[in-house]
Regions:
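N-terminal "arm"/small-domain region of PLP-dependent enzymes with the aminotransferase-like
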Residues: 1-50
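Conserved PLP-enzyme active-site core in the AAT-like
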Residues: 2-9, 62, 74-290, 303
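Conserved N-terminal alpha-helix of the aminotransferase class I/II PLP-enzyme fold
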Residues: 32-77
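Short glycine-rich or small-residue beta-strand-to-loop segments that form or flank ligand, phosphate
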Residues: 42, 69-71, 149-152, 333-337
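Conserved C-terminal alpha-helix-loop-beta "cap" of PLP-dependent enzymes
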Residues: 283-363
Length: 363
């Protein structure tokens, strides 16, 4: 696959041209030679019709979306944009949202003056995770007649919501389904059909490429899928420009461009090997440790049955040179995407060798 942003910045870095433009580093410091601004030929993220538009089209084909737009402001920018696109007519400010959402959704609702009808997941060991059913979504739609339904899948502990049934309910009522898939960009390469929301009825969704793919922090995608969403597509870039920086990082955009080439040529084999290694580690640990049923790229342990709090276990693993993604009183989460099979196996063995505290159970 061609990499137009990478190719342009490579050629510019080699050109020897005097950079009488921003940024102030002028490409003379480490990591800065490819960091440019909207010079001639470099396109512009929010008015893309050149190399950025071409790169976005490449990524859209990989994700089988109607349209994919780049964000250098993470999924936060995509979430603000999705909600604004749904609420832009001003007639309906209501959003039905699953309560275990990221704070960027809350911030967007405050900024956009949205009215939220909360959908509460069924409690399952944690306040940040829980099962959500199509029936619960339908009750919320019938109660509030929202402009859209918003859910997070995978959630922070790695649990995936069955989106198909929820999408059917939303579309039966003529309501848009928005999915915060920030932790699940790599799901485009797992399963048949892939587990990514694009394949299961999401009208729009966001991916934080930097969370699970080889992209720089802040690199994200906004996917537009449903024909009903197409009428908003022309406004998407304009809305993104309202919330995003007018100086989006070319290093981030270059990394998204190179990521497209990685996904096109190597991602299928890479993530299949990761899943096989992760499955082996989960099988190794499951006889002793309480392993949650999660997405392939997360190893989530429910720690109380093993005599630890999640934060205690995180401190112990740090001594083994393993830094986890998240820990609280009851859970610990390790992200496996981006690791080699050997690194995943090392993590598993490190956990399996930990001593089990004795737990006194009164009779």
């Amino acid at each position: 696959m061609n990499t137009p942003i990478k190719d342009f910045t490579d050629n510019y870095a080699k050109s020897g041209i005097i950079r009488a433009h921003m940024p102030g580093h002028k490409g003379k410091f480490p990591l800065t030679e490819f960091d440019i601004t909207e010079i001639k030929g470099a396109d512009s993220l929010f008015e893309a019709d050149g190399i950025i538009a071409e790169s976005e089209k490449n990524t859209s084909e990989i994700f089988h979306s109607y349209k994919t737009l780049y964000s250098a402001g993470g999924s936060t920018l995509c979430i603000f944009t999705m909600l604004a696109m749904c609420l832009m007519n001003g007639k309906n400010r209501r959003v039905a949202a699953v309560r275990n959402c990221h704070r960027s959704f809350l911030n967007a609702c405050v900024f956009l003056d949205a009215e939220v009808e909360w959908i509460y997941p069924e409690y399952e060991n944690s306040l940040v995770s829980g099962k959500i059913t199509p029936e619960a979504v339908e009750r919320a739609i019938e109660k509030s007649s929202p402009a859209c339904v918003y859910l997070t899948s995978p959630d922070y502990l790695g649990h995936i919501t069955e989106i198909d049934g929820i999408a059917d309910i939303c579309h039966k009522h003529g309501v848009m389904l928005l999915v915060d898939n920030a932790h699940g960009a790599y799901l485009n390469f797992i399963g048949e059909p892939p587990m990514h929301p694009n394949y299961h009825g999401a009208d729009m969704c966001c991916d934080s490429a930097h969370k699970t793919l080889p992209a720089l922090t802040g690199g994200a995608y906004l996917h537009i899928n449903n024909p009903k969403a197409e009428k908003y597509e022309g406004y998407a870039k304009e809305i993104m420009s309202m919330f995003g920086s007018t100086s989006p990082s070319y290093l981030i955009m270059r990394s998204l461009d190179e990521c497209a080439d990685f996904m096109d040529t190597r991602a299928g084999k890479y993530f299949n090997e990761m899943k096989l290694a992760a499955d082996k580690v989960k099988s190794l640990l499951s006889p002793v440790w309480h392993i949650e049923d999660t997405e392939a790229g997360k190893l989530t342990l429910f720690t109380p049955p093993c005599g630890y709090t999640g934060t205690e276990l995180a401190d112990i693993l740090r001594e083994y040179k393993i830094e986890c993604e998240y820990a609280d009183h009851t859970h610990i989460v390790l992200m496996l995407t981006g690791l080699s099979a050997e690194e995943i196996t090392y993590k598993g063995k490190g956990i399996s060798n930990l001593p089990q505290p004795s737990i006194f159970v009164p009779t």
